[in-house]
Amino acid sequence: VSYTAVLVRAAGLALARNPELHQLLAGTRRLRPARVDIGLSVANEAAAAPVMQLHDVPGKPLLALAAEIERRAPEVRAEDTRTLAKLRRWGFIVPTGWLRRLVLRRLFSSLRFRKLFGSLQITVLPSVDIVASGVNGTTAVLAMGRVSERVVARGGRPAVRLMATLCCTGDHKVWDGQRVGKLLGEIARILETDELAKEVPVHEAEAATHVALDSAG
């Protein structure tokens, strides 16, 4: 089980348990979707990573979610490569900056476009310790750097634990610092307990990556 799948599952559960945070902003409309969908950034050849739509994350057990991410990632990359090829061929049709800004403004006001990114977008960059991302098309972006062993204080004594730093950037029209803190607190609680480990059968757990880790940030 990848750490990416663990984070997606934890974030989906956290949003479902805090419905006041589960909102989409489309133009002047603030909407509350019936299900928690999450957009996962998938690295590809362009600077702007394509987003994999993961529907009803709270309703999918960890192993099923991990399998879906692994199965669909190549498909998302292939589709993005085809889209980039079309843009390189036909992008000259919208050459001027003001016209491109107009197109983007119309897109960001579209509920259908907003749903492409889910209620929350997640990006994971295991090559660095800390990563933060701007909000572009979604309500908030949750970012995680590498998971590594670090020394922390536990019960007044040093201990080695798997840790990761989470950074969350939210659209201030919908979220504020307190809401972001509430979401991160719930995600940390899920990650630091054995809640997700219980979703992995014993025979799978022996071969899987440990899913409980300490979080900071």
Where in the sequence are the language-model features?
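C-terminal catalytic/motor cores of large multi-domain enzyme assemblies
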Residues: 1-217
